[in-house]
C-alpha cells in the first residue's frame, strides 16, 4: 500500500508518499507561501531531479491539488493514478484529552479536533484545512489523524496537573499535554530494537533537540513525563522560546515593556531562547560558529541549553528510578557531537559514558556509548512521517 503523509502549517505544506511494503518514501516535497505572493511547490521524486513549480496558491485545497497533480505527472510523477494511494495520514498538533491514539477521521473526530483549536490556535486550523482539502479532492480515500499530543496521554495525573485550583483543569482543561509525541514514540520503538529488548521493562529518556526541543521519560513503551506543557513554550530553552520561567517574570516584562498579553506571548515564543540570549541566531549551527569565534553570549547560550537538558535528564532519571538508555534525536540531537558530549559529561552517576570516536556520528543510528556504560547513549534520527504512515497503515488494516 502507498500512504500519503500530509503536514499542514499556516502557510506551508510538507508531504511524503511512502511505499509501505518497503517503508520508504517514493516522493516528498514542500509547498511554501500558501496565501502569499511567490508561492512555490518543490517536489522531489526519490529517484529523480527535484521539480520547482510556481503558481498562485491561495489556500490549502489548491496546494494539495498541486501536490496530487505532481504525484501523477507523466514527466516527474511517481504513480500512474491517484487510485494507487490507499490512505492519507495527517499530522494534527493538538488532540487535547480526546485522543490517546491515532484515529480514522469521521465527522465526530473533525468536530473534536475543532474543539481543540483554542488549545492550538496557530496549528490546528491549518491541520483541519489540510484534512478538508483531502476529503474534497480524494473522496472515498480513508483519512487518519495522528496527534502530536497522543503519545503523552499515558502520563498519570500527578505528572500532568499544575499547582492551580482543580476547577481550572475541569473548566479550561489546563494541564500538561506535551508535544513531539510522534517523534518520541518512533525513537523509543527504534531504541528497543537497537537494544534488542522488548519495550516492556525498558526505561528510556528521549531528547528531541532542535529549534523546538522536548524531553520525555518513557517506561514500558509509554510516556510518563515530558518537558513541554500546556503549550510548547514550557520546558527546555529552545531556538526562540524561553522555556521554563518564573511566572511572575511575565507580568513584570509586560509592565516594564508596556506589552499586551498577546504581545508578551509572541515575545516569549519568538524572541527568546538561544536567539535572545546569544543575540546571534536561533540556529544552533550559527551559535556554535559564533562561540568558536570568541562570542561570549553565544557560548553562554550553549552552556545554558546543555545545562537545561542535563537537568531534565537528571529529573527524569529520578522519575524512572534510573535509565537504560538516553536517546538523542532531531536536528541538533542527531548532528551535534559537541552538544551530546556537553550533555552526557557529568552523567556518569547514571552509568552514561560516551565513546568519543563513536560520538562523531551525524544523522545515523548509532550506539555511541563507551563499552563500560550501563546506561546506553543512542543517536536515532527521527522519522515522524514514517511513524504517521505506520499508524495510518495499522488503523486501515484493523478496519
UniProtKB/Swiss-Prot annotation:
It catalyses: acetate + ATP = acetyl phosphate + ADP. Its EC number is 2.7.2.1. It is found in: Cytoplasm. The record marks 180, 241 as: Transition state stabilizer. One of its GO terms (biological process) is acetyl-CoA biosynthetic process. InterPro entries: Ac/propionate_kinase, Aliphatic_acid_kin_short-chain, Aliphatic_acid_kinase_CS, ATPase_NBD. Mg(2+). Can also accept Mn(2+). SUPFAM superfamilies: Actin-like ATPase domain (SSF53067). Homodimer. This is Acetate kinase. The gene is ackA.
Amino acid at each position: 500500500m502507498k500512504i500519503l503523509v500530509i503536514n499542514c502549517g499556516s502557510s506551508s505544506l510538507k508531504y511524503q508518499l511512502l511505499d509501505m511494503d518497503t517503508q520508504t518514501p517514493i516522493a516528498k516535497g514542500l509547498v511554501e507561501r500558501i496565501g502569499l505572493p511567490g508561492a512555490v511547490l518543490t517536489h522531489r521524486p526519490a529517484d529523480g531531479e527535484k521539480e520547482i513549480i510556481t503558481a498562485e496558491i491561495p489556500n490549502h485545497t489548491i496546494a494539495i491539488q498541486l501536490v496530487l497533480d505532481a504525484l501523477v505527472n507523466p514527466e516527474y510523477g511517481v504513480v500512474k493514478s491517484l487510485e494507487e494511494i490507499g490512505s492519507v495520514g495527517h499530522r494534527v498538533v493538538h488532540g487535547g484529552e480526546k485522543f490517546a491514539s491515532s484515529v480514522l477521521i469521521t465527522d465526530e473526530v473533525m468536530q473534536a479536533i475543532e474543539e481543540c483549536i483554542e488549545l492550538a490556535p496557530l496549528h490546528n486550523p491549518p491541520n483541519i484545512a489540510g484534512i478538508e482539502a483531502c476529503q474534497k479532492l480524494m473522496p472515498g480515500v480513508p483519512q487518519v489523524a495522528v496527534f502530536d499530543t497522543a503519545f503523552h496521554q499515558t502520563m498519570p495525573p500527578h505528572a500532568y496537573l499544575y499547582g492551580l485550583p482543580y476547577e481550572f483543569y475541569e473548566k479550561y482543561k489546563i494541564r500538561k499535554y506535551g508535544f513531539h509525541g510522534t517523534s518520541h514514540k518512533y525513537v523509543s520503538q527504534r531504541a528497543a530494537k537497537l537494544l534488542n529488548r522488548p519495550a516492556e521493562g525498558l526505561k528510556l529518556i528521549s531528547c528531541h533537540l532542535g529549534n523546538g526541543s522536548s524531553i520525555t521519560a518513557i517506561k514500558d513503551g509509554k510516556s510518563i513525563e515530558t518537558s513541554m506543557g500546556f503549550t510548547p513554550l514550557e520546558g527546555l530553552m529552545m531556538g526562540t522560546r524561553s522555556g521554563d520561567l518564573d511566572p511572575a517574570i511575565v507580568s513584570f516584562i509586560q509592565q516594564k515593556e508596556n506589552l499586551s498579553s498577546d504581545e508578551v506571548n509572541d515575545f516569549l515564543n519568538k524572541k527568546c531562547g538561544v536567539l535572545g540570549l546569544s543575540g546571534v541566531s536561533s540556529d544552533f549551527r550559527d551559535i556554535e560558529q559564533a562561540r568558536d569565534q570568541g562570542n561570549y553570549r553565544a557560548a553562554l547560550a550553549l552552556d545554558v541549553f546543555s545545562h537545561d537538558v542535563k537537568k531534565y535528564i537528571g529529573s527524569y532519571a529520578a522519575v524512572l528510578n534510573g535509565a537504560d538508555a538516553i536517546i538523542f534525536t532531531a536536528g541538533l540531537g542527531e548532528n551535534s557531537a559537541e552538544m551530546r558530549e556537553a550533555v552526557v559529561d557529568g552523567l556518569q552517576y547514571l552509568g552514561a559514558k560516551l565513546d568519543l570516536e563513536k560520538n562523531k556520528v551525524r544523522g545515523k543510528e548509532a550506539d555511541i556509548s563507551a563499552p563500560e556504560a550501563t546506561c546506553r547513549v543512542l543517536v536515532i534520527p527521527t522519522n515522524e512521517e514514517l511513524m504517521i504512515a505506520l499508524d495510518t497503515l495499522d488503523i486501515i488494516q484493523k478496519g
